[in-house]
Amino acid sequence: MKISVCVPVYEMKNGLSKRFLIEYLAHLMYQSYTDFDIVVSDQSENDDLKKICDTFSNVLDIKYVKNTSGIKNAANNVNHATKHATGDIIKLLYMDDFYVDRDGLKKVAEAFEKNDGKWLICGFVHCNQDKTKFFDQRTPWYGNKYPNGDNTTGNPSTYAVRKECLIEMDENLLWIVDGEYFYRSYYHYGDPIIIPEVQVCFREHEDSAFLKQEFRDLEVKERKYVEEKYKAML
């Protein structure tokens, strides 16, 4: 069972994108499961991140694709990555996050082989920018049965899905895009497969989107959009 690990990349301030991508790919080198490739969708204007991918291509199966859509949001970049994925399982893992379980991909493959579920979430922990402090470990659960954009699951780095069940992220959303994506997975495919153990780490850093007030200010507007969207569907 082949897994495509999809990573949307973009320019961050103070060179963080280059540092994070190097660490990201280095972590994947040590995964015990080897039947996987990495799909990198790059929104950045220069070739700095491409050069990093070219270097790691000597030891990892990397498919690098430039995203020239001009739409600078996470959902568009995720969708661009997943469109180029060929694995049986699509695994999302953001550039600033990383695996802390070297058997993580193996456990994802085994979970899909043993269960009929269409999508999956796993346990996660948080860390600071320099990975010197780890905190707020969480056991995954999916508790949002309502189309309001609430997110009880973490970010999409916990998420994997069978390729034939892949859905696109809503590119109209910035702040509650994750919660709506999880809800739509539930809406179409029911409850997720759950791996309770911690597999991935969410890194909090100076350029984290969830810290930016301009995104937080979108909450009321986006919740209304989501509620109206599902009124038309239900």
Identify the function of each model-found stretch.
Residues 98, 103-134:
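Conserved donor NDP-sugar-binding/catalytic core segment of glycosyltransferases
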Residues 6, 140-222:
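Conserved nucleotide-sugar donor-binding catalytic segment
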Residues 68-85:
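Glycine-rich, basic loop-to-helix element that forms the pyrophosphate-binding segment
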Residues 2-4, 29-40, 60-63:
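Short loop->beta transition adjacent to catalytic acidic/histidine clusters or analogous donor-positioning motifs
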Residues 90:
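Short aromatic/hydrophobic "clamp" motif used to bind/position activated sugar donors
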Residues 42-51, 94:
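A conserved acidic beta->alpha catalytic loop
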Residues 13-30:
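Short, well-formed alpha-helical segments that are part of the catalytic scaffolds
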Residues 28, 42-45, 69:
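Conserved short acidic donor-positioning loop in nucleotide-sugar-dependent glycosyltransferases
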